[in-house]
């Protein structure tokens, strides 16, 4: 495990209660509904970096089957307490997805991965999708990369997102949506959302 990942996980382990409280009121319904509309009824979802389990719970209530994982043991416990799901404790690099999935939801999670590692990690998970499966990713908007307040952040703008997805074999970018933060009092913060899908016959450039 690299130092950036270790420090980021330690941050969440030490601040889990505060993080859960800060994100519980996030109004994610619109993004969740958009993602759900891309999936078959009752389909399988991987909540990649599930955090508090807030989104996993919403998808369970909507009738989907959900696998959840997170790198922080404290966040895994919080997600299990909220959802009753068996939440896998593993890093993005170590976790072995139990696909095939109809969709992968990576909300505000892969932004903690250094950019040099992102194509390989995203490619690993894209390969666990069914053909036509949806892959949602969100990042803080911008070009900053590095440690900030105890966590690693890899921010993305439109150009960086297009380049990232283009370097993942089989993944096709359908839309980039720039949105305001949905947490109470955080509307001034901006997010870049990538809506993509996996097609086994798509080939990206290297």
Where are these regions (language model features)?
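Conserved class I S-adenosyl-L-methionine
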Residues: 1-41
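Class I SAM-dependent methyltransferase SAM/SAH-binding core
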Residues: 46, 52-94
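A short acidic, Gly/Pro-enriched loop at the edge of an enzyme's catalytic core
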Residues: 93-104
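A short glycine-rich, Lys/Arg-flanked "PGG" loop and its adjoining helix->strand segment in the class I
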Residues: 119-131
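Conserved beta-strand signature within the Rossmann-like core of class I S-adenosyl-L-methionine
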Residues: 132-139
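Acceptor-substrate binding/catalytic loop of class I
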Residues: 145-160, 183-185
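Conserved S-adenosyl-L-methionine
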Residues: 170-182
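Core SAM-dependent methyltransferase catalytic element
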Residues: 182-206
């Amino acid at each position: 495990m690299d130092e950036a990942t270790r420090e980021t996980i330690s941050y969440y382990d030490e601040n889990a209660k505060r993080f859960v409280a800060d994100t519980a009121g996030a109004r994610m319904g619109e993004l969740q509904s958009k993602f759900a509309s891309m999936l078959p009824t009752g389909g399988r979802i991987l909540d990649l970096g599930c955090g508090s389990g807030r989104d996993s719970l919403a998808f369970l209530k909507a009738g989907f089957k959900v696998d959840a994982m997170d790198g922080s043991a404290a966040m895994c416990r919080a997600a299990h307490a909220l959802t009753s799901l068996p939440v896998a404790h593993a890093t993005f690099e170590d976790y072995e997805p139990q696909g095939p999935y109809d969709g992968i939801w990576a909300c505000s999670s892969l932004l903690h991965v250094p950019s040099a590692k992102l194509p390989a990690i995203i490619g690993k998970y894209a390969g666990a999708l069914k053909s036509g499966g949806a892959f949602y990713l969100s990042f803080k908007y911008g070009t900053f990369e590095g440690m900030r307040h105890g966590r690693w952040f890899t921010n993305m703008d439109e150009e960086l997102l297009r380049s990232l997805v283009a370097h993942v074999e089989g993944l096709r970018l359908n839309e980039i949506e720039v949105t305001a933060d949905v947490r109470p009092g955080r509307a001034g913060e901006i997010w870049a959302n990538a809506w993509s899908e996996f097609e086994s016959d798509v080939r990206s450039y290297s």
